[in-house]
Swiss-Prot record:
This is ATP-dependent protease ATPase subunit HslU. Keywords: ATP-binding, Chaperone, Cytoplasm, Nucleotide-binding. It comes from the Bacteria. A double ring-shaped homohexamer of HslV is capped on each side by a ring-shaped HslU homohexamer. The assembly of the HslU/HslV complex is dependent on binding of ATP. GO terms for molecular function: ATP binding; ATP hydrolysis activity; peptidase activity; proteasome-activating activity. It is found in: Cytoplasm. CDD domains: RecA-like_HslU. SMART domains: AAA, ClpB_D2-small. The keyword Nucleotide-binding applies. ATPase subunit of a proteasome-like degradation complex; this subunit has chaperone activity. The binding of ATP and its subsequent hydrolysis by HslU are essential for unfolding of protein substrates subsequently hydrolyzed by HslV. HslU recognizes the N-terminal part of its protein substrates and unfolds these before they are guided to HslV for hydrolysis. One of its GO terms (cellular component) is HslUV protease complex. One of its GO terms (biological process) is protein unfolding.
Length: 436
């Protein structure tokens, strides 16, 4: 299922969306390629090759999450992002770390199901067309009548005609489930019962809709009939085991420092609970057992207060690749505004175009935006590229509000307009830190 790229191609693809941070891009590109290399090996050796998990160190807003998320999208791999602070040691109130793997399996099932749906889309569309014709002319109509209506249907002449269709009532089969504390996967029995009763009942509901709007629910319905659910689950478990990527953010927040308070006990407990996951263990899910041996773990943190060496030595050893991401410079911020395929400026221009307003942002305006972002990051708090969104929203506030009334006009943003719009924000910067 995973798409194969060479490390150079992976870095090149990441460059389209993320500025700078070449060391981090190289590390994740090599890790991705090593997965493909492992799958080319024979059985015994393949089992021995473990993924080289990565620890990204760098301030907020420099691209840590963006790199991991783009990597997963690029590879077509199941990806889950979690914050380390959301989890608690087993025995405390809160989520336990095994839920990370269960979430990964759910995402893998969604990915595999979408892939399988695409494979049966043509067949499902043909079946859906037959059901629309049944609703239009009845099942007993002559072949000539059906063909006549089929031609009209394909030409779009019947799009607005109202019909009644019968589709599966998926909601009727859903049963609320819960995990029993200390018994991961204990909801399996409940799920199996709901599936049994669902198959026995096979309930449907009648919907009144237009011919045009009927196709989507009918295609979904027919796709489900053509899919083998057991095969989807088995493939999803395999994909999650071999291609899954888990991104653990804010891992520095659970690093314990010498002389810490009692809360450090729970933080250290979370680290100890993470150890078997990262090293390789078997987790029970409602779909079956899943091994975590070959899942790629990418941990990240700013490490402003703590240091990577404050993590448990065992956990440090399971994150062998260390990458430091650099703080963003003025030039980086300027490039972020313009170079990525979906840069902020391109986004705002596209949004205004939906209102028939032509937005132009000059080069000196881009320089001014970058300068202001750097200044605010230095004077308040360094939140990296996220500061650009704050600045852009303030600058374009007026045009965003009045755009519906100015269809067919052009609007030019230059350095003078930027400074005029942002003046009060920059002036109040010293006061803003005292506002709760």
């Amino acid at each position: 299922m995973c798409v194969v790229f060479s490390p150079r191609e992976t870095v090149s693809e990441l460059d389209r969306f993320i500025i700078g941070q070449s060391d981090a891009k190289r590390s994740v590109a090599i890790a991705l390629r090593n997965r493909w290399r492992r799958q080319q090996l024979d059985g015994p050796m393949r089992d021995e090759v473990m993924p080289k998990n990565i620890l990204m160190i760098g301030p907020t807003g420099v691209g840590k999450t963006g790199i991991a998320r783009r990597l997963a999208k690029l590879a077509g791999a199941p990806f889950v992002k979690v914050e380390a602070t959301k989890f608690t040691e087993v025995g405390y109130v809160g989520r336990d770390v095994e839920q990370i793997i269960r979430d990964l399996v759910e995402i893998a099932i969604s990915l595999v199901r979408e892939k399988k749906r695409d494979e049966v889309k043509v067949k499902a569309h043909i079946n859906a067309e037959e059901r629309v014709l049944d609703a239009l002319v009845g099942k007993t109509a002559s072949p000539a009548t059906r063909e006549s209506f089929r031609k009209k249907l394909r030409d779009g002449e019947l799009d607005e005609k109202e019909i009644e269709i019968e589709v599966s009532d998926n909601n009727s089969n859903s049963t609320s489930t819960f995990d029993i504390p200390g018994m991961p996967g204990a909801q399996m029995g409940i799920m199996n019962l709901s599936e049994i009763f669902g198959k026995m009942g096979n309930r449907t509901k009648v919907r009144k809709t237009t011919v045009k709007d009927a196709f989507k629910p009918l295609i979904d319905d027919e796709s489900e009939k053509l899919l083998d659910q057991d095969q989807i689950i088995q493939e999803a478990l395999r994909v999650a085991e071999n291609d899954g990527i888990v991104f653990i953010d804010e891992i520095d927040k659970i690093a314990t420092r010498d002389g810490g308070a009692s809360a450090a006990v729970s933080r250290e407990g979370v680290q100890r609970d993470l150890l078997p996951l990262v090293e390789g263990t078997t987790i029970a899910t409602k779909y079956g057992q899943i091994k975590t041996d070959h899942i790629l773990f990418i941990a990240s943190g700013a490490f402003h207060v703590s240091k990577p060496s404050d993590l448990l030595p065992e956990l440090q050893g399971r994150l062998p690749i260390r990458v430091e991401l650099n703080p963003l410079t003025r030039e980086d911020l300027r490039r972020i505004l313009t170079e990525p395929e979906a840069s902020l400026i391109k986004q705002y221009i596209a949004l205004m175009a939906t209102e028939e307003v032509h937005l132009e942002i000059t080069d000196d305006a881009i320089d001014a935006l970058a300068d202001i972002a750097v200044d605010l990051n230095a004077r308040i708090e360094n939140i990296g590229a996220r500061r650009l969104q704050t600045v852009m929203e303030r600058v374009l506030d007026e045009i965003s509000f009045t755009a519906p009334d100015k269809a067919g006009t052009s609007f030019k943003v230059d350095a003078a307009y930027v400074k005029k719009s942002i003046g009060d924000l920059a002036a109040d910067v010293d006061l803003s830190r005292f506002i709760l």
